[in-house]
Amino acid sequence: MTVSENSVLETEVLVGGSAMPNERPGAMEPQKLSKMPEGFPRRSTVANGVRSRASRRFLVVGGALLLSLFAIYEMGAVFSIGGITPLEYLVLALFAVNFCWIALAFCSGIAGFLILLRKPRAKDLQVTELHTRTAILMPTYNESPDRVFSAVSVMAETLSQTGHGHAFDWFILSDTTDPDIALLEEQAFLVLRQETHKHSRVYYRRRRKNVARKAGNVADFCRRWGSRYDHLLVLDADSLMESSTITGLAQRMQADPDAGLIQTIPSLINGTTLMARLQQFAARIYGPVIGTGLGWWVQKEGNFWGHNAIIRTEAFMTAAGLPNLKGKPPFGGHIMSHDFVEAALIRRAGWSVVIAYDLPGSYEECPPSIIDLAVRDRRWCQGNLQHSRILPTKGLHWVSRLHLLTGIMAYLSSPFWLMLILTGLMLALQAHFIRPEYFTDQFSLFPTWPIMDSDRALRLFYITMGVLFGPKVFGVLLLLKDGEFARSVGGRIKAIFSVIFEVILSALIAPIMMFIHCGAVMSILMGRDSGWSPQRRDDGSMPWMTLIYRHRWHMLAGVMLGYAAILDSLTLLAWMSPALIGLWIAVPISAWTGSVKIGEVFKRAGILATPEERNPAQICLQAHEARAAYQKHIAEPWTLAQVLKDPALMELHLAMVDKQPLRAAGTPIEAMEAIVHVKVHEARCQQSALAVLNRQEMAMVLANPLMLRSLQKLPEQFVEEDLVSFC
């Protein structure tokens, strides 16, 4: 059968036409990191786009540098009165690294605070018609199909009502490896097509092999279909976006031909556990301060967070092809945290990368528990540390390098903070147990007393706490100033209670996360790869024994640090207690914060409430209703046995299988594919074949029409006369 005949057959089988449109192949070559590609950077074509002003960088980065130099000088002065020892030099160095990290966030927060005081409004571009085409991509990997497909259904329907639906196509790009979920996705896609085919173009493709994970998934789309579209709007499996935001992004791209990528700042929604609600509240109250400040000073040298952003296809395909790094994982191989690197490469090529901090209506969800956060952060930590090999890339803008460095420090800061705590503890124990040398080798009539400037040290402590908690304070001030905002979270009194509770609970969780990040860094330095595990989205609860096992080292570390502190004095133990209590009760904290029931208690009490929870956007309500409907639609899942038995079901399934050519005859065959071929061809019936195929092999069979046809030809069961089976 020819390709055209096959397409006609699919159109007849599937409501709304083929599962994917005709391919229009395009090149997306891996970029060279050691030298600038020819013709880069491109020249700007218009003067009405975003400009980068050095004055903003000077105010924020320069301010952070001056603040850091002052703090480092003060810390040096604390030690210098009696002469600085080697251990004190180490404390000074660790303090310098950690303070620079928080000073930049503080200065960005000041900028964001001042901007938000004026209540900026989203820019009205006055564009009435879109003449560009945008592909909206929803990558998914072993996610709940009811969540993914219902979200697309609602977004597609609301977008069609704006009159701009003709400018957008929707693509669900699956990398699912679980055969049961893969079949559920197909069922959900049939429902989605039935609902949307009259007003929207919605497509589905599941890759046979998920090479390079999410980045490879999007790159595969670009190479095969990307040339059909001017822009790519990339979502995540838990993303939602209002139609006004979708059209606003496309209009901004259309109005600024220099724009290569525009990133929104998503709001967190749908948190049911206490941990998820904590993240939602913190992101809603304090997040805009940092995000707005960051967007204000980075300007054309913004960043990409992997989703809820629109990308110019030309910029992405010509400038952001990711190379494989030399060596094996965790530092070699595919680039895991692809988003920062893609943004840096797009900017290197001369396109602008902008953070649209003024554009609302972008949503995502967050991990439901500390353990789920740890699993995600282990993967992110590996990807961000991998960026140490991207930093020397030729031609990157210094702000892009700073983004990469900031991502690295997001995880390296934990070991640095831990080392600072340990060296400070060692200084205290040294002063308590080791007799000081009052007379040095040099002749002196007076002894040398080991002293520090305690008043200056206390003042520096207050300054450090102010810098650390400054962005939180700015967020609270904005909340208290804005009466409408305060009412949207339950009023000022309840908001203050929520802030106090968030600060206390975050302080308890922080040392646990510090040790989790330290463990992740150590694991990576020891050469261990994170793999790619699907994320839990709703319930974060786990058995208590599992939690004890996962937090055993955290509790032990807390006990050991507490014992070391009490050897010096109860005063030192009291000073360290904010960092120790969370470690001592890590297991109950992890259990309680991951509980949906406890999260519901706090929701009813109105603690940690957000505007999106108390007054949800219409699209969020619609998505919730649609998900319940999809759960009913796919309540009776297909099985591979049913697909083989039912010819109509088989034709439906084959119409949704990726049409990428199979391995050509005579070319090398992978081990698993060879094993599956043997199992299929040796099987005497469908039942025996399914009995010997594991889940990974079943997923491969589902994506291979030839194997499916071979299995379909076999009898359902094998019966041999006069043969008696004994159990």
Curated annotation (Swiss-Prot):
<feature type="transmembrane region" description="Helical">
    <location>
        <begin position="460"/>
        <end position="480"/>
    </location>
</feature>
<dbReference type="InterPro" id="IPR029044">
    <property type="entry name" value="Nucleotide-diphossugar_trans"/>
</dbReference>
<feature type="region of interest" description="Disordered">
    <location>
        <begin position="18"/>
        <end position="41"/>
    </location>
</feature>
<feature type="transmembrane region" description="Helical">
    <location>
        <begin position="572"/>
        <end position="592"/>
    </location>
</feature>
<keyword id="KW-0812">Transmembrane</keyword>
<keyword id="KW-0472">Membrane</keyword>
<feature type="transmembrane region" description="Helical">
    <location>
        <begin position="58"/>
        <end position="78"/>
    </location>
</feature>
<feature type="transmembrane region" description="Helical">
    <location>
        <begin position="278"/>
        <end position="298"/>
    </location>
</feature>
<comment type="function">
    <text>Involved in the biosynthesis of osmoregulated periplasmic glucans (OPGs).</text>
</comment>
<feature type="transmembrane region" description="Helical">
    <location>
        <begin position="408"/>
        <end position="428"/>
    </location>
</feature>
<dbReference type="GO" id="GO:0016758">
    <property type="term" value="F:hexosyltransferase activity"/>
</dbReference>
<comment type="similarity">
    <text>Belongs to the glycosyltransferase 2 family. OpgH subfamily.</text>
</comment>
<dbReference type="InterPro" id="IPR023725">
    <property type="entry name" value="Glucans_biosynth_gluTrFase_H"/>
</dbReference>
<comment type="pathway">
    <text>Glycan metabolism; osmoregulated periplasmic glucan (OPG) biosynthesis.</text>
</comment>
<feature type="transmembrane region" description="Helical">
    <location>
        <begin position="496"/>
        <end position="516"/>
    </location>
</feature>
<keyword id="KW-0328">Glycosyltransferase</keyword>
<keyword id="KW-0808">Transferase</keyword>
<dbReference type="GO" id="GO:0009250">
    <property type="term" value="P:glucan biosynthetic process"/>
</dbReference>
<feature type="transmembrane region" description="Helical">
    <location>
        <begin position="97"/>
        <end position="117"/>
    </location>
</feature>
<dbReference type="InterPro" id="IPR050321">
    <property type="entry name" value="Glycosyltr_2/OpgH_subfam"/>
</dbReference>
<dbReference type="Pfam" id="PF13632">
    <property type="entry name" value="Glyco_trans_2_3"/>
</dbReference>
<keyword id="KW-1003">Cell membrane</keyword>
<keyword id="KW-0997">Cell inner membrane</keyword>
<protein>
    <recommendedName>
        <fullName>Glucans biosynthesis glucosyltransferase H</fullName>
        <ecNumber>2.4.1.-</ecNumber>
    </recommendedName>
</protein>
<dbReference type="GO" id="GO:0005886">
    <property type="term" value="C:plasma membrane"/>
</dbReference>
<keyword id="KW-1133">Transmembrane helix</keyword>
<dbReference type="InterPro" id="IPR001173">
    <property type="entry name" value="Glyco_trans_2-like"/>
</dbReference>
